[in-house]
């Protein structure tokens, strides 16, 4: 169970088809057939941005463009940017500069694209700039600057689920775009607009295609997952000839029938989230809830334009755990928000001790250009913010370590993510990829990514656990039911 601190050097997850700095397309994902015009691609930021990158790459590959692994091999480079906080803006601008230096022909898209003047002031030679989720515009700009390839026979081999930048056994499923909330620390609505929900049948069709392609875990994402369907008044759609409402609960019910892991991320704490807990307890979706609380003090929450209070959240957490004892809760918090007093910070620490959350991400408040919170009085000095962040980490670190050590002696189903020199590395239902802990199966080599095995936890620290394979892998009734199946 992890506590993440804010690291400006890691704030934007960088995914790229280029060897500089990281190559992520495996040989079977990158065509490299030497046919048609060649594209390099860099994707920065969150999983929502990664899904946008997948859509753009899928369209380009379908049209016959070749995706290549180096700047030098590319005829043009696309940079999908992040602009959420200042450190992400800096990394995006640096990456654009790197692509221009190494290649010279660059198209910019993504969240930072809404600040075209800022980009062109620093990088006037970029070919084109588009905003987020502007898939068709990006492709049109590629057409303008690179000839559309003649028919590439390898393009016919693009699978129905499209190009994926994740390992084969899990995938992100984005169900909506934008957000209707106006949190004072956030500028996402100004970049991505208000909530726009995808048709429920469209979402379920994609989920089915992903399952048929071998995906065993769906990570449901959006800017505000629990608001799904609010913009269309939860209208009824159809899937497989049956009516299904554009609503989070009914979507989860249908996804739960597919027989694969379904994990919910970015869940805003609406009251109807309570209705999802029975689905988790029944094994329809994973008993895992990524729900950002941000703070515990009522006054600070009001300044953030966030709902709730410590008392109400604690009541709900207690109720959820009574209904679903195996529930794992991930949350994020901001310390050092403008105006936060020592007493209000201590209230946050008291909340942590009582809530006993499983996974926590912690961030010292950082001003974001355009955020209304920047205008609030009494900013917290940087040294105090960092001191509070360290204290927050210490408290949550002890909680995380204790909760993981309580798993020692229990058996869990583990999905294998990789095999290295020390053995297999995987995750339980309690571990989302990239952000949570790992299960280390030292000495286990005869497995491959995507396999599922049963294992008993024998050791833990505040981040990861170590486990050994259970003797009987086939008798599921003999194993603990705590791990999701």
UniProtKB/Swiss-Prot annotation:
Catalytic activity: L-aspartate(89)-[ribosomal protein uS12]-hydrogen + (sulfur carrier)-SH + AH2 + 2 S-adenosyl-L-methionine = 3-methylsulfanyl-L-aspartate(89)-[ribosomal protein uS12]-hydrogen + (sulfur carrier)-H + 5'-deoxyadenosine + L-methionine + A + S-adenosyl-L-homocysteine + 2 H(+)
E.C. number(s) listed in UniProt: 2.8.4.4
One GO term of the biological process aspect: tRNA modification
Manner of cofactor binding, per the entry note: Binds 2 [4Fe-4S] clusters. One cluster is coordinated with 3 cysteines and an exchangeable S-adenosyl-L-methionine.
Binding site for [4Fe-4S] cluster 2: 179, 183, 186
Gene transcribed to yield this protein: rimO
Cofactor section: [4Fe-4S] cluster
Protein name from the UniProt record: Ribosomal protein uS12 methylthiotransferase RimO
Organism per entry: Alteromonas mediterranea (strain DSM 17117 / CIP 110805 / LMG 28347 / Deep ecotype)
Residues the entry annotates as binding [4Fe-4S] cluster 1: 46, 82, 111
GO cellular component term, pick one: cytosol
Function: Catalyzes the methylthiolation of an aspartic acid residue of ribosomal protein uS12.
